[in-house]
């Protein structure tokens, strides 16, 4: 049983509109990057390989291949650093955690698209 004050604070922080996505989906995350005194948006596009649903502590991991090297980045879902998220493609997978994609490369690492 959690404290009502904590629940109220967490509900207040979870006001951001988050699109519905699941592991296997390809998403584009617009991240706020601060360089010196100016700020800009940087897009990170990849496949969601893990999702952790814990209220305000929710997080998800996105994997992409950049110049032949696998890059993974974990985002806090309700972080103020995330400007926006968009789902580009729905993936058809049977597992909740797609860590096996780390060992695959090229065409073997493709994910089938979910049709309707």
Curated annotation (Swiss-Prot):
InterPro entries in UniProt: Ribosomal_bL19, Ribosomal_bL19_CS, Ribosomal_bL19_sf, Translation_prot_SH3-like_sf
Function per UniProt: This protein is located at the 30S-50S ribosomal subunit interface and may play a role in the structure and function of the aminoacyl-tRNA binding site.
Family the entry assigns: Belongs to the bacterial ribosomal protein bL19 family.
HAMAP family, per database record: Ribosomal_bL19
PANTHER family: LARGE RIBOSOMAL SUBUNIT PROTEIN BL19M, RIBOSOMAL PROTEIN L19
Domain of life: Bacteria
Lineage: Bacteria, Pseudomonadati, Pseudomonadota, Gammaproteobacteria, Pseudomonadales
Gene3D superfamilies: 2.30.30.790
Coiled coil: none
GO biological process: translation
The protein's name: Large ribosomal subunit protein bL19
SUPFAM superfamilies assigned to the protein according to its UniProt record, in alphabetical order: Translation proteins SH3-like domain (SSF50104)
Keyword Ribonucleoprotein: yes
GO molecular function, one term: structural constituent of ribosome
Keywords, ordered alphabetically: Ribonucleoprotein, Ribosomal protein
Any GO CC annotation of this UniProt entry: cytosolic large ribosomal subunit
Matches recorded under NCBIfam families: rplS_bact (TIGR01024)
Pfam families from the UniProt entry: Ribosomal_L19
């Amino acid at each position: 049983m959690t404290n009502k004050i904590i629940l109220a604070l967490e509900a207040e922080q979870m006001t951001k509109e988050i699109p519905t996505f699941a592991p296997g989906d390809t998403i584009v995350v617009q991240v706020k990057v601060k360089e010196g005194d100016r700020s800009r948006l940087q897009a990170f596009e990849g496949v969601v390989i893990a999702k952790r649903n814990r209220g305000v502590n929710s997080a998800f991991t996105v994997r992409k291949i950049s110049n032949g090297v696998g890059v993974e980045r974990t985002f806090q879902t309700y972080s103020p650093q995330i400007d926006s998220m968009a789902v580009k493609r729905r993936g058809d997978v049977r597992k909740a955690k797609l860590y096996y994609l780390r060992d695959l490369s090229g065409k073997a690492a493709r994910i089938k698209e979910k049709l309707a």
